[in-house]
């Protein structure tokens, strides 16, 4: 069960009748750098933009969830046209925080006071529940972390990219940098959140940065990460080869491997075999997304146990290139296993 202490803060951004967008309140606190990033993400600072009702992402190891609404009558908010509720947390669980934020939005629309929102926030922190007759209720134990991790659809990813999904699988297995572009943030969030499922054995969603702007503070934050899945709505990201090993153009269904990653990402018989396996599993109408993820994970564990068995015979259970050569693998397979051993920290340096 997700624990209430995972929430870090609650914030409120308003756009007034003069079209000014400002931070108006937060509890207990949000630092200035994060506030600046949240203003950029909330869509209220942009002119003539479509309203993005819910976005999420990660900055400096903090997850943020932003729900934005247009003020509707009847309301006590006479000078406000739109507002965004910002929740920051330690955990990845978009559905949980979207549901909680909807309750907070209704509360603020009705009362026009952050105090009422703070009461709801504290109730969830202390009791795991926030109840109200007119604004709806929220129960934290309804939102299981595993469900959040499984909510992205790998079957959709495979149906779009087919055999090329093996490029994404290889990149994630080797902890490479994957950049995904789509002009529509909703499509970007839906696609990117599914990719860590390809490496389910790690259950590591900290690699996910689904909504990044081409701004220095965000790019510097990204560059300190070893490998990642980063989503961008700006088409100029395709020219930023310093940011990616693999570039995914979602609208055009194209995947490109950058020049500097081609050696580590070279494909062979093993890749073809895994690629076929992934496609067959995903195309089976009787199999759910969760079953497809499990199938791929079992296949991955087979590969890793083969690596481990080689390492068992080696010095300190660490692999060397010489150990791998004893397996007499084809060059592309040997190359992949060598880079995989490095990614899994099984390599003797």
From Swiss-Prot:
Listed name of the protein: DENN domain-containing protein 10
A single MF term (Gene Ontology): guanyl-nucleotide exchange factor activity
Role played: Guanine nucleotide exchange factor (GEF) which may be involved in the regulation of late endocytic pathway homeostasis, including endosomal positioning, maturation and secretion.
Gene Ontology CC: late endosome
Organism of provenance: Danio rerio
Domain spans labelled dDENN: 296-349
Ranges where the cDENN domain occurs: 160-294
InterPro entries: FAM45, Tripartite_DENN
UniProt record similarity statement: Belongs to the DENND10 family.
GO BP field: endosome transport via multivesicular body sorting pathway; protein transport; regulation of early endosome to late endosome transport
Keywords carried by this UniProt record: Endosome, Guanine-nucleotide releasing factor
Signal peptide (UniProt feature, chain positions): none
Subcellular location: Late endosome
Domain uDENN, chain residue ranges per copy: 1-135
Pfam families: SPA
């Amino acid at each position: 069960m997700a624990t209430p202490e995972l929430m870090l803060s609650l914030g409120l951004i308003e756009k007034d009748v003069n079209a000014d967008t400002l931070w108006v309140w937060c509890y207990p606190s949000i630092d200035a750098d994060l506030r600046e990033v949240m203003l950029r993400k909330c869509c209220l600072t942009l002119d003539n933009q479509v309203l993005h009702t819910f976005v999420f992402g990660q900055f400096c190891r903090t997850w943020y969830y932003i729900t934005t609404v247009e003020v509707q009558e009847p309301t006590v908010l006479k000078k406000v046209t739109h507002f965004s509720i910002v929740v920051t947390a330690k955990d990845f669980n978009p559905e949980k925080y979207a549901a909680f934020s909807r309750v907070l939005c209704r509360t603020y629309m009705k009362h026009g006071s952050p105090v009422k929102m703070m009461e709801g926030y504290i109730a969830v922190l202390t009791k795991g529940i926030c109840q109200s007759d007119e604004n709806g209720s929220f129960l934290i134990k309804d939102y299981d972390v595993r469900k959040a991790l499984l909510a992205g659809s790998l079957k959709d990813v495979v149906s779009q990219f087919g055999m090329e999904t093996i490029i994404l699988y290889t990149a994630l297995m080797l902890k490479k940098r994957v950049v995904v572009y789509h002009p529509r943030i909703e499509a970007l969030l839906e696609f990117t959140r599914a990719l860590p499922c390809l490496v389910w054995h790690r259950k590591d969603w900290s690699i996910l940065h689904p909504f990044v702007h081409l701004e220095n503070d965000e790019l510097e934050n990204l560059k300190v990460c070893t490998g990642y899945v980063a989503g961008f709505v700006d088409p100029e990201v395709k020219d930023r080869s310093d940011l990616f090993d693999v570039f995914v153009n979602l609208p055009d269904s194209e995947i490109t491997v950058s020049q500097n990653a081609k050696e580590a990402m070279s494909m062979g018989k093993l890749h073809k075999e895994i690629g076929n396996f992934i496609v067959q599993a995903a195309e089976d109408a009787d199999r759910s997304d969760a079953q497809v993820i499990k199938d791929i994970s079992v296949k991955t564990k087979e590969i890793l146990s083969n690596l481990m068995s080689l390492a068992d015979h080696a010095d300190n259970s660490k692999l060397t290139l010489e150990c791998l050569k004893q397996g007499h693998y084809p060059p592309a397979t040997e190359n992949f296993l060598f880079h995989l051993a490095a990614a899994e920290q099984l390599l003797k340096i």
